Amino acid sequence: MSKSASRARLADIIRTRSFGRGEITLASGRKSDFYFNLKPTMLDPEGAALLAELTYETLRDEKVDYVGGLEMGAVPLAGAIAQLSWLKNHPISAFFVRKKPKEHGARLSVEGLAKGESLAGKRCVIVEDVTTTGGSAIKAVEAVKESGAEIVLVLTMVDREEGATEAFAAAGLPFRSLYKASEFLNT
């Protein structure tokens, strides 16, 4: 399937499985009359494969070592990207950032690394399923930077176009999205 065909098919899946209208309170605390819940798309076999494919194509030339983001939204996405990258013979490892470290065990903020493995000096991309203001992704960026990593990109599947671009620019972070909310609202 061509990139444009993959993108169109994924948009159809998102529209069917993950987009809705009706009043909702967003993670940012804002109210909205539409929403995206990408988990049904990320956990659908075809949706997961297309998200991984389009994301991998975006990252392929970035010389990325790791991909990850804030739990819960980034976990299935990071895993799918890591798996596809292995199949493409260009491995990109995955991690996730806890919203709050567990109060038992290793008490880690960044999970998924083997004993002795570190993000220090590694090129990382922060992925997110849906971005509104950028606040959640910036929390993940801060935790990953504390681990010594270089953030080369913040990549979201859907940008709600409600301030994230400006927030990332102010933080000096490159930002891209696979889709904009307006692509779904205007159809």
Swiss-Prot record:
Disulfide bonds: none annotated. One of its GO terms (molecular function) is magnesium ion binding. GO terms for biological process: 'de novo' UMP biosynthetic process; pyrimidine nucleobase biosynthetic process. Its cofactor is Mg(2+). InterPro entries: OPRT, Or_phspho_trans_dom, PRibTrfase_dom, PRTase-like. It comes from the Bacteria. Catalyzes the transfer of a ribosyl phosphate group from 5-phosphoribose 1-diphosphate to orotate, leading to the formation of orotidine monophosphate (OMP). This is Orotate phosphoribosyltransferase.
